[in-house]
């Protein structure tokens, strides 16, 4: 016991105390060299002075009065050290237990991983077994299919062989039958020839008798027929009443055939002139039998309708409106007094109201109107002259008077001196000039053209009044915008039957703005704007026409109008270049009639 000698008093663990086992020393000795520096004798370095000091201390302790207290203190220290060692032992045991638990957890984890791996291996093995089974099954199916195909091929080969054998048998039978037939026919021919050779004199006698009888029969028939016809003709000639009746009947038959043939043609032309419509006329207000049958209500409304204002729905400048109103009044008075109508030429840009005014003029004057286009004349070729005469013949049969409106008249009423006009078109133009050479109280001729300078001089001579329809000004454009906005937008929206609504904005102000933006546009282009607004509203999801949609359509129309103007300028430059190539061409054009 070292504590008895006063040694190692501050150490936490006295030597030789039973309890926590000391860890073994590492193999190979201490770090100071191992067996190399270890002494050969274990008692060679023993120091006996320590024992002497211990013995001396023990004697002093026994002689001291505090020996008992020192002993108790040593016991207490020893107990404290033992308790500390026990606590360390418990900690060590807890650490060992934790290590065991960790080992158990690791073993469980390894076992779980092993089980998972075994499960995967089992699954892989099962999948592989299933794959092998499927492959075996597919191989079996393939083998079975190959076997079936082989059996089928063998059956087909067997059938083909049987069919070949059957065909060979049939061919052999046919060949034998043919040989037998040939032998039979040959035998019959030999027998027949032998019989004919033996009976040749009898056969010749029979033929001779039949020919004599036939000749006698024919001669007797000719004699009998001649006698009958001769007696009949003699009887017919002797009776003059029969001769007269026969001649009269043949004459009446010939006259009837000729009359029916020519009368049908005359009746057809009369019906076509009175009731039909010529092929050149595209549109007419004149009532025909076919239209009366197809549209009886429309025809009845037209008959009983009141006289309309000539400028109703037509928006023109004040000066032009005053002039065309005078023309309408003069035409109406001419119709009432059965005077001679005046021919009018209306020229100007397209879409300025020429066709609309012609229709309104006819309705205002209680006249029928017929519209034909100049572009329909040229394709007719040689039939153009006949068609032109049919138009004027049909116009002359109108009881109310007819306003014949020729739209795009410059398409066929060109100068005859130019090389571009064909002979058929030249003949049609001559027919037109012939039928319009004098004033008429049956029809009124109204020509419309965008290029009146291309007219033949004789056409200009037949015109009594020239009216220029210019593009609408600011005031006219505003009236047109308001008219078509009301017609295509406001009226459908107010009826409530259609899917069209208008957003809230100042309509009057917007119409004034649009009139300013649409400078240079014609009335037709403005009307198309109204249709575009309506289409935009129908195309929207909610059916509401907004101010932005109106502005977008107007901007698009302005861009298109500018593009058209650029094309027109380019075309004008090209025509100017062509005229510059032949400076004598304007002097050669025009042939007065």
UniProtKB/Swiss-Prot annotation:
Which of UniProt's keywords are assigned here? ATP-binding, Coiled coil, Hydrolase, Membrane, Mitochondrion, Mitochondrion inner membrane, Mitochondrion nucleoid, Nucleotide-binding, Transmembrane, Transmembrane helix
Name the job this protein performs: Essential for mitochondrial network organization, mitochondrial metabolism and cell growth at organism and cellular level. May play an important role in mitochondrial protein synthesis. May also participate in mitochondrial DNA replication. May bind to mitochondrial DNA D-loops and contribute to nucleoid stability. Required for enhanced channeling of cholesterol for hormone-dependent steroidogenesis. Involved in mitochondrial-mediated antiviral innate immunity.
The family database entries (SMART domains) matched by this protein are listed as: AAA
Q: Where in the cell is it found?
A: Mitochondrion inner membrane; Mitochondrion matrix, Mitochondrion nucleoid
Q: How does it sit in the membrane?
A: Single-pass membrane protein
List of residues binding ATP: 348-355
Compositional bias, Pro residues, is annotated for 12-27
What Gene Ontology cellular component terms go with this record? mitochondrial inner membrane; mitochondrial nucleoid; mitochondrion
Topological domains, Mitochondrial intermembrane = 1-242
- Ranges of the Mitochondrial matrix topological domain: 261-593
Primary subcellular site in the record, as a coarse category: mitochondrion
Name the segments for region: Disordered: 1-64, 109-129, 145-164, 570-593
**Catalytic activity annotated for this protein?**
ATP + H2O = ADP + phosphate + H(+)
Q: Lineage of the native species?
A: Eukaryota, Metazoa, Chordata, Craniata, Vertebrata
- What SUPFAM superfamilies does its record include? P-loop containing nucleoside triphosphate hydrolases
Provide a Gene Ontology MF annotation, just one: zinc ion binding
Name assigned to this protein:
ATPase family AAA domain-containing protein 3-B
Comment, domains: The transmembrane domain and a C-terminal adjacent region contain all information necessary for mitochondrial targeting.
């Amino acid at each position: 016991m070292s504590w008895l000698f006063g040694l190692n008093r501050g150490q936490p663990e006295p030597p030789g105390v039973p309890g926590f086992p000391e860890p073994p020393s590492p193999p190979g000795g201490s770090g100071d060299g191992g067996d190399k520096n270890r002494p050969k004798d274990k008692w060679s370095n023993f120091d006996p002075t320590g024992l002497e000091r211990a013995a001396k201390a023990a004697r002093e302790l026994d002689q001291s009065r505090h020996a008992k207290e020192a002993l108790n203190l040593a016991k207490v220290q020893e107990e404290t050290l033992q308790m500390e060692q026990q606590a360390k032992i418990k900690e060590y045991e807890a650490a060992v237990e934790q290590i065991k638990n960790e080992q158990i957890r690791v073993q469980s984890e390894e076992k779980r991983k092993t089980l998972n791996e075994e499960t995967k291996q089992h699954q892989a093995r099962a999948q592989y077994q299933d794959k092998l089974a499927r492959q075996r099954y597919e191989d079996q199916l393939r083998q079975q299919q190959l076997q079936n195909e082989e059996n089928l091929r063998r059956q087909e080969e067997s059938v083909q062989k049987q069919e070949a054998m059957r065909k060979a048998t049939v061919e052999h039978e046919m060949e034998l039958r043919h040989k037998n037939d040939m032998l039979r026919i040959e035998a019959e021919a030999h027998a027949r020839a032998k019989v004919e050779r033996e009976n040749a004199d009898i056969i010749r006698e029979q033929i001779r008798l039949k020919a004599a009888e036939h000749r006698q029969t024919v001669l007797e028939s000719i004699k009998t027929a001649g006698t009958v016809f001769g007696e009949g003709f003699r009887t017919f000639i002797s009776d003059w009443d029969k001769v007269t009746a026969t001649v009269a009947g043949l004459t009446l038959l010939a006259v009837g055939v000729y009359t029916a043939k020519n009368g049908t043609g005359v009746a057809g032309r009369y019906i076509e002139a009175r009731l039909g419509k010529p092929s050149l006329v595209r549109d007419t207000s004149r009532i025909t039998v076919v239209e009366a049958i197809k549209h009886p209500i429309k025809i009845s409304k037209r008959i009983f309708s009141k006289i309309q204002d000539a400028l109703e729905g037509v928006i023109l400048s004040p000066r032009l409106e005053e002039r065309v109103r005078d023309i309408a009044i003069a035409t109406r008075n001419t119709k009432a007094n059965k005077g001679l109508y005046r021919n009018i030429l209306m020229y100007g840009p397209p879409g300025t109201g020429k066709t609309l005014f012609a229709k309104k003029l006819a309705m205002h004057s209680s006249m029928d109107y017929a519209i034909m286009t100049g572009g329909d004349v040229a394709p007719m070729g040689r039939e153009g002259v006949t068609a032109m005469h049919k138009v004027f013949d049909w116009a002359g049969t109108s009881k109310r008077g007819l306003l014949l409106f020729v739209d795009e008249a410059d398409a066929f009423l060109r100068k005859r001196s130019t090389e571009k006009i064909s002979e058929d078109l030249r003949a049609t133009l001559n027919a037109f000039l012939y039928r319009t050479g004098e004033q008429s109280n049956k029809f009124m001729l109204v020509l419309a053209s965008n290029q009146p300078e291309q007219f033949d001089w004789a056409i200009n001579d037949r015109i009594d009044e020239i009216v220029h329809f210019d593009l609408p000004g600011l005031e006219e454009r505003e009236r047109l915008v308001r008219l078509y906005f009301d017609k295509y937008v406001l009226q459908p929206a107010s009826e409530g039957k259609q899917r069209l609504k208008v957003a809230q904005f100042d309509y009057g102000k917007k119409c004034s703005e649009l009139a300013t933006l649409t400078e240079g546009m014609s009335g037709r282009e403005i009307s198309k704007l109204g249709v575009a607004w309506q289409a935009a509203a129908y195309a929207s999801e909610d059916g509401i026409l907004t101010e932005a949609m109106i502005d977008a359509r107007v901007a698009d129309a302005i861009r298109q109008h500018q593009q058209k103007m650029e094309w027109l300028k380019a075309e004008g430059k090209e025509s100017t270049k062509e005229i510059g190539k032949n400076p004598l061409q304007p002097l050669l054009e025009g042939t007065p009639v």
